[in-house]
C-alpha cells in the first residue's frame, strides 16, 4: 500500500485538475471523506470537481462544499486524475462508471476489503471508516488538518461506526475521533445539523413506515417500506436518508430489519442487523454490499416483487445460519 500512496502523492503533485467521486446513494462516510479530500487538495492549489450519481442534498448541505457536486461536466480528458472515495465497486459510480474506467490515471481510496480493484491504483485498508484512511493519507502528505477537513472526516467516522455503536467501532475509531476533535472538528454541528435534524415531513413519513412495517416473529426480521406515493404525500425528497430507520426494529428484538425505498430508478434497500448477523451476504445476492451490519442494494423491479425477493433471501440466510 505504501507504493500506491507514493503513486497517489506523485500524481497529485503533477495534476492540475482532479475529479473526486462518491458512491451512488451516498452515506456520511463517502460524502465526509470526499469533502475532506476536496478541501485538502484545494490547499495544494488544485482545481477539484465533485461527482456523484445521486443528487447530494438534505442534511448533507450543512457541509457547504456539497453544493458543488455535479456542477461540472465529467469528460475524462479534462482531468489529470480521478479518485473514487469509499467506492467498493465500479457499479457504485453509476453513470460515471464507464468514463472513470477509461481514465489512465485513476485511484480508488477505500476501506472495503472485498471490493473490486477497478482503478489503476487501489489504496485499500480495512478500517472502521474510509474517513480514517483519508486522515492517515493526509497526515502522510503533511497537510495541516483544520476544521474544514476535520469536521467532514468526523461526519464520515460517525456514519460508518453508527455514531460509535456498531461492530466496526474499535479503539482506532476513538483515537481518530480524538485527533479530529483536537484539530477543530465541529462535533456539535455534525450531530445537530446531520444526525438530529429532521423536518416535520420526514417525521410523519418515518412514522408511517414504522407503523406499517411487516414483521416475522418466527424468523425475527422486519420489513419497512417508503413508497413513491408516500414520498409525494409527505413531500419528502427521494434522496432524504431513511437508511437507519430499520434500527428501531433491532431495538425491539428483531435480528434483521430492512427498508425498501421506492424511487424513480428502482427499489433501494437498506439492511441493518444485530452484531451476529451478516446482512452484506443478503445484499450481495442483489449485486449490492457494504458492511456486516449495514448494507444496501438496488433492485430493478416493482416494490411488491422486491419485497418478495428480499424476504426470500432473508429467510434463506437465516435458515442456513440457524446453527
Which residues fall in each region the model found?
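Hydrophobic helix-and-loop "lid/oligomerization" segment in the mid-to-C-terminal part
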Residues: 2-24, 30-61, 71, 76-79, ...
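Conserved beta-strand scaffold positions in the cores of enzyme catalytic domains, especially
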Residues: 106-108, 121-124, 221-223, 259
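Generic enzyme active-site microenvironment
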Residues: 21, 25, 84, 108-109, ...
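Short alpha-helices
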Residues: 109-176
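Active-site cofactor/cluster-binding pocket
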Residues: 64-120
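Short, motif-level signal for alpha-helix interfacial/capping segments enriched in acidic residues
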Residues: 2-7, 88-89, 138-140
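An acidic intrinsically disordered interaction segment
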Residues: 1-6, 98-106, 126-134
Amino acid at each position: 500500500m505504501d507504493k500506491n500512496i507514493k503513486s497517489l502523492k506523485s500524481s497529485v503533485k503533477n495534476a492540475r485538475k482532479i475529479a473526486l467521486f462518491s458512491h451512488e446513494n451516498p452515506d456520511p462516510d463517502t460524502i465526509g471523506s470526499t469533502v475532506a479530500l476536496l478541501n485538502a487538495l484545494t490547499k495544494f492549489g488544485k482545481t477539484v470537481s465533485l461527482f456523484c450519481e445521486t443528487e447530494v442534498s438534505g442534511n448533507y448541505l450543512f457541509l457547504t462544499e456539497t453544493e458543488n457536486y455535479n456542477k461540472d461536466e465529467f469528460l475524462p480528458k479534462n482531468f489529470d486524475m480521478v479518485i473514487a472515495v469509499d467506492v467498493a465497486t465500479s457499479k457504485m459510480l453509476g453513470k460515471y462508471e464507464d468514463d472513470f474506467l477509461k481514465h489512465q490515471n485513476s485511484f480508488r481510496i477505500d476501506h472495503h476489503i472485498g471490493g473490486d480493484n477497478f482503478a489503476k491504483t487501489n489504496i485499500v485498508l480495512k478500517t472502521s471508516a474510509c474517513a480514517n484512511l483519508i486522515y492517515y493519507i493526509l497526515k502522510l502528505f503533511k497537510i495541516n488538518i483544520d476544521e474544514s477537513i476535520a469536521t467532514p472526516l468526523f461526519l464520515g467516522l460517525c456514519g460508518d461506526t453508527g455514531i460509535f455503536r456498531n461492530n466496526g467501532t474499535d479503539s482506532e475509531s476513538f483515537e481518530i475521533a480524538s485527533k479530529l476533535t483536537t484539530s477543530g472538528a465541529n462535533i456539535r454541528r455534525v450531530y445537530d445539523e446531520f444526525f438530529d435534524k429532521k423536518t416535520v415531513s420526514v417525521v410523519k413519513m418515518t412514522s408511517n413506515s414504522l407503523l406499517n412495517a411487516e414483521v416475522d416473529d418466527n424468523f425475527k426480521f422486519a420489513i419497512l417500506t417508503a413508497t413513491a406515493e408516500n414520498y409525494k404525500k409527505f413531500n419528502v425528497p427521494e434522496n432524504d436518508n431513511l437508511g437507519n430507520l430499520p434500527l428501531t426494529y433491532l431495538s425491539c428484538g428483531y435480528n434483521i430489519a430492512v427498508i425498501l425505498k421506492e424511487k424513480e430508478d428502482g427499489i433501494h434497500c437498506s439492511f441493518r442487523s444485530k452484531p451476529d448477523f451478516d446482512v452484506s451476504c443478503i445484499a450481495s445476492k442483489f449485486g449490492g454490499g457494504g458492511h456486516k451490519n449495514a448494507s444496501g442494494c438496488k433492485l430493478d423491479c416493482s416494490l411488491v416483487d422486491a419485497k418478495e425477493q428480499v424476504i426470500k433471501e432473508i429467510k434463506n440466510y437465516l435458515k442456513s445460519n440457524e446453527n
